[in-house]
Regions:
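Conserved C-terminal guanine-recognition region of P-loop GTPase G domains, centered on the G4
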Residues: 1-7, 23-97
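Flexible beta-alpha connector loops of hexameric P-loop NTPases
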Residues: 13-22, 73
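Short, surface-exposed acidic/glycine-rich loop or hinge patches that mediate macromolecular interfaces
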Residues: 15, 46-49, 101-104
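Surface-exposed beta-strand edges and their flanking turn/coil or helix-capping segments
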Residues: 22-24, 111-112
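Alpha-helical transmembrane helix bundles of large polytopic membrane transport and channel proteins
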Residues: 67, 77-250
Length: 250
């Protein structure tokens, strides 16, 4: 329990992607789709971002509500490396917070942001700026923490003050795969989107990307749709076009 909210947390198996290559990947993906969690806390290893952020891009394509916990942040600091997580948050368009779970560092902030996401707080406006009311709330909430016992001031100070100065972060952003792939994704997505009943549960962009990757699990699902034959025809056509243009498959 935190700030009057009761959290039901499901710890899913660790995975670096949402492909269909391992049982863990399939299980995690199906859980997200079938159980539709209110908010996803995407815990990444701060010292191995390149490997971890691929999963983040896939979660973005799934259109889930998400906050990224940059965990084991103390080890990154101890190594002498630095991370501009303010910029990283802007580039991905999702809140990213440094945490050290073993020391309870940053966890209060993390769950406060989770509550805001759950309540449907609009973190970003149409221009990609962070909502000033959200900034005000985070700043005031952080200031109230300074009087709490054993509060680690640095765990939010830098994050909130930085945003207070700049007042800008980018909105939830899908990774652009380049003109050829994006054209293929859009073509498949247009046909998939004709099935309005699936929109509340599936991201049509995510389904389209996975179809172009020949994901067997997603293809099996798509074959149950009324226009499955046309979807797969367009997928095959666009996949061939990408292969001919880029000399590699999707």
């Amino acid at each position: 329990d935190f700030e009057g909210y009761h959290f039901r947390i499901v710890d899913l198996p660790g995975t670096y992607s949402l492909s269909a290559y391992t049982p863990e990947e399939i299980y995690v993906r199906r859980h997200i789709i079938d159980e539709t969690p209110d908010v996803i806390i995407n815990v990444v290893d701060s010292s191995n971002l390149e490997r971890n952020l691929y999963l983040t891009t896939q979660l973005i394509d799934m259109n889930v509500r998400m906050v990224v916990a940059l965990n084991i942040y103390d080890e990154l600091e101890a190594s002498g490396n630095t991370l501009d997580y303010h910029l990283l948050s802007k580039l991905f368009g999702v809140p990213m917070l440094p945490t050290v779970s073993k020391k309870n560092r940053g966890l209060d902030t993390l769950f406060h942001v989770v509550i805001n996401l759950y309540e449907g707080v609009d973190f970003f406006d149409k221009q990609g700026n962070m909502n000033p009311e959200v900034l005000k709330d985070l700043t005031e909430w952080h200031d109230s923490l300074e009087d709490r016992k054993n509060h680690e001031e640095e765990h939010l100070e830098d994050y909130v003050r930085e945003h207070k100065r700049t007042g800008r972060v980018f909105r939830h952003i899908h990774i652009n795969h380049g003109p050829d792939l994006e054209k293929a994704i859009e073509a498949v997505k247009e046909e998939v989107s004709k099935n309005e009943f699936i929109r509340h549960k599936y991201s049509t962009r995510f389904l389209s990307i996975k179809l172009l990757e020949n994901d067997p699990d997603i293809e099996s699902f798509v074959r149950t749709l009324p226009n499955a034959e046309e979807i797969l025809r367009i997928r095959d056509k666009m996949a061939k076009r990408v292969q001919d243009t880029m000399n590699e498959d999707c």
